[in-house]
């Protein structure tokens, strides 16, 4: 098959997905670990622009842990963690907000705008998108680590209606205005649920869920809530993947139709996952017969 035939076949394969998802809402969570490589970042932005141009309604939620660590180090502020959660005092919170809402957020918006689409930079405070509260993390006081009390999607829906791409930093506030550092996976998951999103896509620096972490070819392509519970109980899902899986389960239980975990360092992984038959990562599918109670999953097992 020559190159022209291959290109034609790719377009034909993508066509039913373009037709199916036109007008659908996708929430894309862009992880800090996947942001380190500028080339990968530019490819992902190109994928987002492509999906927007074919009629998808996109919301981007981002974290930025490595960048936060970098700036705390430059300021000679020690990064402190407990069980993988960043202990967030007042000074650390100021740096977190500065880096997420002031630096990373505006960089992503600029990249989108430079490609001809309309990105709008926000954080959870804007339009009271997120109402936060202090997270309960056992007996340890984690400072200004927050969890989501409620989501108001009105501003996001208004922007989507006008064909903007909201880019949301994972910072929120409570009813008194106190600012909290919130895990970006859970921010993306709760926003996806509030929007009735077709898909939640977690862009990371890992291929997805592996049946054997030492075997890259053991990628689990499709799974569901019951199977995820089994993988968690067997310890196959561990460390930083646990909060991603927990937020995925919560999202599915609240009506998001599918959740995907993909490796954002692979060229055009977002397009490959969404517009091809075989995909490139792990896909979690909703099954009503095994719907779980939301209180089975705690916000305390979160890495920020």
Curated annotation (Swiss-Prot):
Catalytic activity: N-acetyl-L-glutamate + ATP = N-acetyl-L-glutamyl 5-phosphate + ADP
Major localization class: plastid
UniProt KW keywords: Amino-acid biosynthesis, Arginine biosynthesis, ATP-binding, Chloroplast, Kinase, Nucleotide-binding, Plastid, Transferase
Keyword Plastid among record annotations: yes
PANTHER family with a match to the protein in the record: N-ACETYLGLUTAMATE SYNTHASE, N-ACETYLGLUTAMATE SYNTHASE, MITOCHONDRIAL
Protein purpose: Catalyzes the ATP-dependent phosphorylation of N-acetyl-L-glutamate.
Cellular compartment(s): Plastid, Chloroplast
Gene Ontology CC annotation, any one: chloroplast
Gene Ontology MF term list: acetylglutamate kinase activity; ATP binding
The protein's Enzyme Commission number: 2.7.2.8
Gene (name only): argB
GO biological process: arginine biosynthetic process via ornithine; L-arginine biosynthetic process
Protein name in the entry: Acetylglutamate kinase
Site (Transition state stabilizer): 29, 244
NCBIfam families, per database record: argB
Involved pathway(s): Amino-acid biosynthesis; L-arginine biosynthesis; N(2)-acetyl-L-ornithine from L-glutamate: step 2/4
Family: Belongs to the acetylglutamate kinase family. ArgB subfamily.
Entry binding sites for substrate: 64-65, 86, 181
């Amino acid at each position: 098959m020559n190159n022209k035939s291959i290109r034609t076949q790719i377009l034909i394969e993508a066509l039913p997905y373009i037709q199916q998802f036109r007008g659908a809402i996708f929430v894309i969570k862009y992880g800090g670990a996947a942001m380190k490589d500028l080339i990968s970042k530019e490819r992902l932005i190109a994928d987002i622009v492509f999906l927007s141009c074919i009629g998808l309604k996109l919301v981007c939620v981002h974290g930025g842990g490595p960048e936060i660590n970098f700036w705390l180090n430059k300021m000679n502020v020690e990064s402190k963690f407990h069980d993988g959660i960043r202990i967030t005092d007042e000074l650390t919170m100021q740096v977190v907000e500065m880096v997420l809402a002031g630096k990373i957020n505006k960089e992503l918006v600029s990249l989108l705008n430079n490609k001809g689409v309309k990105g709008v930079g926000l954080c959870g405070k804007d339009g009271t998108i997120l109402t936060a509260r202090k997270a309960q993390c056992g007996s340890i006081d984690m400072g200004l680590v927050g969890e989501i009390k409620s989501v108001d999607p009105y501003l996001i829906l208004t922007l989507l209606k006008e064909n903007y791409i909201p880019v949301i930093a994972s910072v929120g506030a409570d009813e008194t205005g106190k600012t909290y550092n919130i895990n970006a996976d859970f921010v993306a998951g709760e926003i996806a649920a509030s929007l009735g999103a077709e898909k939640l896509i977690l862009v990371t620096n890992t291929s997805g869920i592996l049946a054997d972490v030492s075997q890259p070819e053991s990628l689990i392509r499709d799974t569901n809530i019951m199977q995820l519970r089994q993988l968690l109980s067997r310890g196959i899902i561990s460390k930083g993947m646990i909060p991603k899986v927990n937020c995925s389960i919560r999202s599915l239980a609240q009506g998001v139709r599918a959740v995907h975990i993909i490796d954002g360092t692979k060229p055009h992984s977002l397009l490959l996952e969404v517009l091809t038959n075989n995909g490139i990562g792990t896909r979690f599918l909703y099954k009503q017969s095994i719907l779980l109670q939301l209180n089975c999953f705690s916000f305390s097992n979160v890495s920020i």
